[in-house]
UniProtKB/Swiss-Prot annotation:
It is found in: Cell membrane. This is Variant surface glycoprotein ILTAT 1.25. InterPro entries: Trypano_VSG_B_N_dom, Variant_surf_glycoprt_trypan_C. Residues 83-95, 396-420, 456-474 have a biased composition (Basic and acidic residues). Residues 485-507 form a propeptide. The keyword Coiled coil does not apply. Residues 384-395, 444-455 have a biased composition (Low complexity). Residues 83-102, 384-474 are annotated as: Disordered.
Length: 507
């Protein structure tokens, strides 16, 4: 096994002997460059924080105004009726409710403008609700309050919170440090050499490159006055930095790197998932152990030998365009750079945004459902205003009986079915046995004659004291005595009518 490794080891030694100090000439840091460019692009092109739909926002705004209108309807009506240039003037304090005084006057004026756009039937409904204290008004008020409360609980999602975006603030902190450093200040004035800014395992870990990602990118990609035309990230940089003087060179180098990062990807929004993936891969690269010394804390390309690693920008043994975040004295214990901590904090904020988004969507659905309920309640309030005055119930028309007076027919031959009459006796051919066929009563000149006939029939039945004697068609045994069956039928009908009336009252 050792004999197979020897040629490789010798070739590395020969390479180290024969290579002059120069900047890297291939895209050895393309991977690290791409990962950090995700952070650079996020500064200006981070995926927008999503918010509620326009329909839900309008419902929330309208609910607050309707609640104000209901509580101050008379005043809102006056404002709505006034000319725009004439409203609102507080001529008398007793005319203006507290909810519309001083700084609140503008809100009431806006509510009045909304009131103007409401349909006439809805205005009638609001007037009805404003004057009633019943369950309908109470339920309507509760529904309006639920809408405004749901929006208030998710103020950022409904666009009512205008504070800066925490995730974006932390992305800027990752790029420029805290306090923020731009221009030549990206590389601190105390970093008079590239090794001081970018790190050396035998001396100190990176200073500027550990504080801000912009400096880390310059260490990975930039040229300097000793190592010009660096190709470690992209084809030859044109801004070479004199770390001892700087003089605008750091700012020029950063501008060039920033432009290269954005080239070809300017239109694409950076997502939380992309930032999270980039942060995870950068952390893995930093903690990866390399070479026989198991050097950790190295970001970027360097030719690792048995000795130190110096990120001085040259392409030579033990050197490279890199960032070192550990030292041999600390046994290569990695110190996580400030910019990576800030990036991970930004990702945590974006994850919190997603939680707020999920909860906000639920609130939005609830608000739209509550709006449907409020619309239904308003429609119920419209109904009483549409009802015409109740008219007195007309007395039922008394049907005229087209039949002939059957009672006048005392002979069976004159009692004809064609006249609506029926002979009730099966034995007699003469007598008072001609009756209306359909059972309806008839008017007669005597009037009292019918009553007399009924009384007679009832008396005939009551004379029968035994059940076996109570066999006449007009008689019926009720358990104790023989009674006229028509009287029993009338009592049964009266009882059923009374029962139906009671059931109707219950429901």
């Amino acid at each position: 096994m050792q004999s197979q490794q020897q040629p490789v080891f010798i070739s590395i030694i020969l390479l180290a002997i024969n290579t002059d100090a120069a900047a890297p000439t291939t895209a050895v840091n393309a991977r690290e460059f791409g990962l950090l460019c995700t952070l650079v692009r996020a500064e200006d092109n981070l995926e927008d924080r999503r918010s509620a739909g326009q329909a839900a926002k309008e419902v929330v705004a309208l609910a607050a105004k309707i609640e104000l209108i209901l509580a101050n309807l008379k005043h809102i009506e006056r404002l709505a009726a006034a000319e725009p240039e004439a409203a609102p003037k507080e001529s008398r304090s007793d005319e203006t409710p507290e909810a519309c005084k001083a700084s609140k006057a503008t809100v009431c004026s806006q509510a009045a403008q909304t009131y103007k756009t409401i349909r006439p039937d809805e205005k009638l409904a609001l007037a009805f609700l404003a004057e009633t204290t019943g369950d309908l008004r109470s339920t309507f008020n509760v529904t309006l309050k639920q809408i405004t409360a749901a929006a208030a609980s998710h103020a950022r999602y409904f666009g009512e919170n205008t504070e800066s975006r925490p995730a974006l603030d932390k992305i800027k902190k990752a790029l420029y440090g805290s306090p923020e450093a731009k221009g030549d200040a990206i590389i601190e004035s105390g970093d008079g050499t590239r090794s001081a800014a970018c790190g050396n395992t035998d001396g100190n870990a990176a200073n500027s490159a550990a504080k801000r990602a912009t400096a880390a990118l310059i260490c990975l990609c930039g040229g300097d006055n000793t190592n010009t035309g660096n190709d470690a990230c992209f084809t030859q940089t044109t801004a070479d930095i004199n770390y001892a003087k700087k003089g605008g060179e750091v700012e020029r180098a950063w501008t060039e790197i920033r432009q290269k990062c954005k080239a070809g990807a300017a239109a694409n929004k950076v997502t939380a998932a992309q930032l999270k993936a980039a942060a995870a891969e950068l952390a893995a690269l930093i903690h990866q152990k390399r070479g026989e010394k198991a050097v950790a804390g190295l970001l970027g390309a360097a030719q690792i030998n048995n000795g130190a690693v110096d990120c001085d920008g040259s392409e030579a043994n033990g050197k490279g365009s890199c960032v070192i975040l550990s030292t041999s004295a600390s046994k290569y214990k990695v110190e996580t750079p400030d910019w990576l901590n800030a990036l991970e904090a930004a990702i945590a904020d974006l994850e919190q945004e997603q939680i707020e988004l999920d909860n906000g969507r639920k609130a939005e659905a609830q608000i739209l459902a509550l709006n449907s309920s409020x619309t239904t309640l308003l429609a119920q309030a419209v109904e009483p205003t549409k009802q015409p005055p109740a008219k007195a119930a007309a007395a039922p028309e008394k049907k005229s009986n087209p039949q002939k007076d059957c009672n006048k027919n005392t002979k069976k031959r004159d009692c004809k079915e064609g006249d609506g009459c029926k002979w009730s006796s099966t034995e007699a051919t003469e007598g008072a046995f001609c009756k209306p066929k359909d059972g309806e009563g008839q008017t007669s000149a005597a009037g009292a004659g019918d009553a007399g006939a009924s009384d007679t029939e009832a008396k005939k039945c009551s004379d029968k004291k035994k059940e076996e004697e109570c066999k006449s068609p007009n008689c019926k045994w009720d358990g104790k005595e023989c009674k006229d069956s028509s009287i029993l039928a009338n009592k049964q009908f009266a009882l059923s009518v009374a029962s139906a009336a009671f059931v109707a009252l219950l429901f």
